[in-house]
Amino acid sequence: GYTGGSLNAITRSGSNQHKGSVFYFTRDQSLVGDGPEALGEPGEFSQDSYGFRLGGPISKDNIFYFVNAEIKSQDQPTGWSLSGNSGQCYGNCDPVISAAATRFENWLAQYNYNPGSRDENVRDIPADKAFLRFDFNVNDGNQLTLRWNYVDAGNVVNRPNSFTYEYPGEAYDFSSETNSLVGQLNSVFGTNMFNEFRLTFQQIRDRRPPVSIFPWVELEDVAPEAGYFGEFEAGSEPFSTRNALDQDIIELTNDFTWIKGNHTMTFGTSNQFFEFDNLFIQNAFGSYEFSNLEQLESGVAREWEYTVVNPGQPETQQFGINQIGLYA
C-alpha cells in the first residue's frame, strides 16, 4: 500500500574542520555458509554498496556544509526454480510437474508470449540516496538549517513459493522516488524563551509497472494425478497493470517555549497539506483463471476479468487533505 508522511530527522552536520570518508561493501553467493541440503545451492546474487561523506566550513564559525551519497545495487534470487539448477525446485522436480509446465508454456506460446525462464529468477533491487545540509549561525540568537534528502529505490517483486510458481514474467517493478526539503530556524530570546520554526516540502513518486505486458493467467491443480494441486501463474500481475501514486506534502510547524520558574510552557501549531494523484486500474490487461490443464487447453476459463475506465472519465483520482493543529 501507500502512505503519505513528512520527514523530520536529526542528522550529521558540518564543523570547522573538513572531514570526509568513502566506503564500499560487497557480498555474493560465495560468502554464504552451508545450510540444509533441502534448500539447495544458493543462486547467484550480489550486493554492492558504496558512497562518501564530506563536511566542513564554508565560513568559519558561521556557515557549514555536509554532503552524503550512497549507491546500492542488489541482485537477489527468489529461492525457487522449475529447473532445479539453483534454489528449491518447485514440486521437487517431479517429471509430472515439468510436463505440466511444458503444456502451460506451449499454450502461452500460441499467443506469442514467453513467461520467462524456468531457472531461478534474480531480482534487481537498487537504491540511490543523497543528503545535503547547510547550517547558518545567523547571529547569537538564531540558527538556520537547510536540508535536502533524496531517495530513488526500486524492487523487482517476484514471489514463487512451494504452492504457487510465479513465472519471472509476472514480476512487477516497484519504484519510489522521494525528494524532501526542510528549512528550520531555531531562535533564542533572552534566557528563558526559544522558538523552533520548521517548513517541510516532500515530493513522493511511486510507480509499479509490470515487467511484461500480457493478461494474467492462473492455472490451478497443475498435476492432480500426482497429488499436486499447486498453481502456475504468468502474465502481468493483476494489481500492477495500471498503478501509480504521486504525493506532494507540505508541513509547517512552529513551537514557542517559555520557561517560567519551575514551569515549561509550549505554544505551537502543526499543519499538514497533502495532494494526491492516484492511478489504480486492476486487470487492465485482463485476467483468466483455469481450474486444470484440460480447461486451459480448451480455452474454458473458470473466471475472467477485464477492467476499463468509463468513457469520458479520467484514469487518475486527484484529491487533497489538510490538517490544521494548534496546541499549548
Residues covered by each model-derived region:
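Acidic, glycine-rich flexible loop segments
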Residues: 1-8, 12-179, 191, 203-207, ...
